A protein has these predicted regions:
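Alpha-helical transmembrane segments and their immediate juxtamembrane cytosolic regions
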Residues: 1-220
Length: 220
C-alpha cells in the first residue's frame, strides 16, 4: 500500500474511531516534515485549514462559555506537533529546546487529541530511521493510551472490569501499526498526487461541516 491509500483508510477511521487516525496522522506528519520542500508552506497549510475547520468543529462539539472558545480542532494539534518537530530540529540549546517542546505539548491541552498527539509525534521522530524503533514506538503508544483508558475506567468498573475498555483502546493503535509497518510501501500514490494532497487537508473541515449541519438540523 502507498502512503495515500493508508491516509484514505485513516480518513475512513476518522468517522468511526479517532484513535487509529491520530497515530496515522502523527506518523505521516513526521514523514512529511522530512520530505517537504518548504516547511513554512507546510505549516501555513495546517494553520489555514485549522482556521477553516474551527467553526464546523464547534458546530459538532458545542461547548458554552470560555471552554468552547478555548477548544481547538485537531489540525491545530497537528500544527503544534509540527512546531514540536521544528523546535527539535532548529533549537540547538538543549534546555531551550526541551522548554519549548514541553510548552507546545501543554498548549495542546486546549486542542483535540490533547497531550497524546505531540507525544506520539516525538515517538515517531525518535523511531524515524529504525524499523525496530518503529515497532517499539507503536507498542509504547498502545500501552500509553491503553493505560490511560484503564486508569479512567477502573474508577467505575474496577481493575478487571476495565480491561475490555483498555484492549478496545489499544487495538486501533496496533491495527494502525500493522498497516504502516507491514503494508506500507513507503511511497505516495503514483497518480493524482495533487488531488490527494489537498483532499487530506479539505476532508477534515468538510466532514465536520456535514456532521455539524446534520446536528443542527436534527437537534436544533
Amino acid at each position: 500500500m502507498n502512503r495515500d491509500t493508508i491516509k484514505m483508510l485513516a480518513m475512513a477511521t476518522m468517522l468511526v474511531n479517532h484513535i487509529a487516525n491520530v497515530l496515522t496522522m502523527c506518523y505521516f506528519l513526521v514523514e512529511g516534515y522530512g520530505y517537504t520542500h518548504s516547511k513554512t508552506q507546510y505549516a501555513g497549510r495546517l494553520f489555514g485549514f485549522a482556521v477553516l475547520a474551527q467553526l464546523p468543529y464547534q458546530l459538532v462539539f458545542p461547548e458554552h462559555g470560555m471552554a468552547g472558545m478555548l477548544r481547538f480542532n485537531m489540525l491545530f494539534t497537528l500544527l503544534l506537533c509540527f512546531l514540536v518537530l521544528a523546535a527539535q530540529e532548529k533549537i540547538h540549546s538543549g534546555f531551550l529546546r526541551v522548554f519549548c517542546i514541553v510548552l507546545l505539548i501543554f498548549a495542546s491541552i486546549f486542542c483535540d487529541w490533547a497531550l497524546l498527539a505531540p507525544v506520539f509525534t516525538l515517538l515517531f521522530a525518535w523511531a524515524e530511521n529504525s524499523r525496530l524503533r518503529k515497532h517499539i514506538a507503536f507498542g509504547v503508544a498502545a500501552v500509553l493510551y491503553g493505560g490511560m483508558a484503564w486508569l479512567s475506567s477502573m474508577r467505575t468498573l474496577g481493575a478487571v472490569g476495565a480491561l475490555p475498555d483498555t484492549l478496545g483502546c489499544a487495538m486501533p493503535i496496533l491495527v494502525s501499526g500493522f498497516f504502516i509497518l507491514y503494508l506500507y510501501n513507503g511511497q505516495r500514490a503514483a497518480q493524482h498526487r495533487g488531488f490527494y494532497k489537498w483532499f487530506f487537508y479539505a476532508f477534515y473541515p468538510g466532514h465536520l461541516l456535514v456532521l455539524g449541519l446534520l446536528r443542527v438540523a436534527l437537534l436544533g
